[in-house]
Amino acid sequence: MSGGRVELGLGTGYHQGEHLAYGIPFPSVPERFERLEEQLGIVTGLWTTRAGGQFIWQGVHYQLSVRGDLPRTVQQPHPPIIVGGSGRRRTPALAARFASEFNIGLHSAAEARAQYERVRRACEAVGRDPAQIGMSGVLIACCGSNEREVARRARSIGMPLEQLSAAAAAGTPAQVIERCAEGQEAGAETLYLQIRDLDDHDHLRLIGEQVLPYLA
C-alpha cells in the first residue's frame, strides 16, 4: 500500500498508564530490555529467513519455530528499524546491533550529542560502521504567529509553556527554526516534529509554510 515507505520503531515502553489501560504487563526495566532484545532478534530473524526455511527462537521470554513463508517486505533485507532512548548502556548496544536509525528526544542538545556518540562507540565495539546508523531527534511542536497563539496551543495540549520550552520546539516560526537548528547542530540528521493536536489544521499549515521550508 505504501510502496515500501514503512519503518518500524521498537522500544521498552515507559508509560505505565498506557500498559495498564490495555491490560499489557509492565515489568521491571531490566526485563523490558531483555524482552526488547529478543523482540528485535525475532523480528529481524523472521524478515531475513528465506522462503521455505525454518526460523527457530529459544529465548528466555519467547520461544517459536515457524517457516519463513511470511509475505516478503518491499524493503530488503527488511524495513528500517528505529531504536531510541536515553539509556546509556543497553540502548546504544541494541541500536548498534539492530537499528537503521537511532532516535532521542531533544530535551538537551548536550545529552543528545553525548548519546549519539555512545551509539557510535557501541557500533565500533561490534565492528559496525557508525555511518550505517542515521541519527534522529524528536521535538514536540508548538508554533504560533505570536506569543498569545503559542500559549493557546500549549494549553490545548495540556502542557504549560514553561514545560514546553525544554521539551519542545515552541514559539514563533523563527524560534521553532532556531530550536530545530540546535538539534541539527547536536548531530540529528533527521528531525521529527510531534504534533499533539491533529485537529488544529492552522498549526499544521503554519509549520508547513513558515518552518519546514527552512529546515530542508
Region locations from a protein language model:
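Active-site-adjacent structural elements that line small-molecule/cofactor binding pockets in enzymes
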Residues: 1-216
